[in-house]
Amino acid sequence: MYGKFCRQLDDKNRIVIPTKFLRDLGEEFYITAGFDQALVLRSEAEFEKFKAKLEATNKLNKNMRELTRYIFANTEEVKSDRLGRITLPKHFLDNFTITKEIVFIGSGNYCELFAKEIYDKKEAQFKDAKKIDELADELFKNGIEL
């Protein structure tokens, strides 16, 4: 998935999923707590792969147990209605400071959902060409050539 879309919550905490993403996610999909104050939306198939990786982690490692517990406790299976809307659970709204405006961004095989205020701060770093060069250098150091 790729692209960026802005949406607004309605009074019933419903949000319209961008059609482009809904095609990949399917009618029923999963929302999980992500990193960087984002929620992550995954298709059922992608969620099963993700779940298998989490379940295969070393349970003797306390940090892995805690992170796995946190992610599974903050996972919801959702189903879109005929208008492509889902209702965001209150705990997601509270924990991820989502009020009204939301930004969906494609992140490869999943999409992320941010409160607009949070995403705007993250995107601002890319207005600095030096920062982009630093991040590109990190990719290169990790074996990814652009």
From Swiss-Prot:
<dbReference type="InterPro" id="IPR038619">
    <property type="entry name" value="MraZ_sf"/>
</dbReference>
<feature type="domain" description="SpoVT-AbrB 2">
    <location>
        <begin position="75"/>
        <end position="118"/>
    </location>
</feature>
<dbReference type="InterPro" id="IPR035642">
    <property type="entry name" value="MraZ_N"/>
</dbReference>
<dbReference type="GO" id="GO:2000143">
    <property type="term" value="P:negative regulation of DNA-templated transcription initiation"/>
</dbReference>
<keyword id="KW-0963">Cytoplasm</keyword>
<dbReference type="GO" id="GO:0000976">
    <property type="term" value="F:transcription cis-regulatory region binding"/>
</dbReference>
<dbReference type="GO" id="GO:0005737">
    <property type="term" value="C:cytoplasm"/>
</dbReference>
<dbReference type="InterPro" id="IPR020603">
    <property type="entry name" value="MraZ_dom"/>
</dbReference>
<keyword id="KW-0804">Transcription</keyword>
<dbReference type="InterPro" id="IPR037914">
    <property type="entry name" value="SpoVT-AbrB_sf"/>
</dbReference>
<comment type="subunit">
    <text>Forms oligomers.</text>
</comment>
<dbReference type="GO" id="GO:0003700">
    <property type="term" value="F:DNA-binding transcription factor activity"/>
</dbReference>
<dbReference type="InterPro" id="IPR007159">
    <property type="entry name" value="SpoVT-AbrB_dom"/>
</dbReference>
<dbReference type="Pfam" id="PF02381">
    <property type="entry name" value="MraZ"/>
</dbReference>
<comment type="similarity">
    <text>Belongs to the MraZ family.</text>
</comment>
<keyword id="KW-0677">Repeat</keyword>
<dbReference type="GO" id="GO:0009295">
    <property type="term" value="C:nucleoid"/>
</dbReference>
<protein>
    <recommendedName>
        <fullName>Transcriptional regulator MraZ</fullName>
    </recommendedName>
</protein>
<dbReference type="InterPro" id="IPR003444">
    <property type="entry name" value="MraZ"/>
</dbReference>
<keyword id="KW-0238">DNA-binding</keyword>
<feature type="domain" description="SpoVT-AbrB 1">
    <location>
        <begin position="4"/>
        <end position="46"/>
    </location>
</feature>
<dbReference type="InterPro" id="IPR035644">
    <property type="entry name" value="MraZ_C"/>
</dbReference>
<keyword id="KW-0805">Transcription regulation</keyword>
